[in-house]
Amino acid sequence: MAGWQSYVDNLMCDGCCQEAAIVGYCDAKYVWAATAGGVFQSITPVEIDMIVGKDREGFFTNGLTLGAKKCSVIRDSLYVDGDCTMDIRTKSQGGEPTYNVAVGRAGRVLVFVMGKEGVHGGGLNKKAYSMAKYLRDSGF
């Protein structure tokens, strides 16, 4: 799915993100394109199911993983009409910094963006939302 890499490149171009990904969540449940060498490159179908699944409460208590990286869910509006986003924060393991992550849901794909250190989640949410809306309006 080489054509999807341009969407990842577009998400990365302003310099506030350290990685981005486009991930299918319907019939093609895998990473379609991602920043090379990043955590998102390793997102699994099980992790995708956790994000889009019917249980919208369990991950608030237990957290979730993205590419085996432990994360906390801050806000879940993935299935709220007009929003379709989720705000996540990575957990520190061994004292490394934590990072904000935003997920936007289109019709068949999820848009993931992870900010650099100190990048506020609100800007990431807007970026994920805008790309997901564009893809949703384009039939994806």
Curated annotation (Swiss-Prot):
Listed A to Z, the keywords are: Acetylation, Actin-binding, Cytoplasm, Cytoskeleton
Q: Name one Pfam family in it.
A: Profilin
Q: Which locations, inside or outside the cell, does it occupy?
A: Cytoplasm, Cytoskeleton
Q: What is its main location?
A: cytoplasm
GO annotation terms (biological process) = modification of postsynaptic actin cytoskeleton; modulation of chemical synaptic transmission; negative regulation of actin filament polymerization; negative regulation of epithelial cell migration; negative regulation of ruffle assembly; positive regulation of actin filament polymerization; positive regulation of peptidyl-serine phosphorylation; positive regulation of stress fiber assembly
For this protein, the record's InterPro entries field holds: PFN, PFN_euk, PFN_sf, Profilin1/2/3_vertebrate, Profilin_CS
**Tissue expression remark:** Isoform IIa is the main isoform and is abundant in brain. Isoform IIb is a minor isoform.
Tell me, how does this one assemble? Occurs in many kinds of cells as a complex with monomeric actin in a 1:1 ratio. Interacts with PFN2.
Q: What does this protein do?
A: Binds to actin and affects the structure of the cytoskeleton. At high concentrations, profilin prevents the polymerization of actin, whereas it enhances it at low concentrations. By binding to PIP2, it inhibits the formation of IP3 and DG.
Protein name as it appears in the record: Profilin-2
Native source species:
Mus musculus
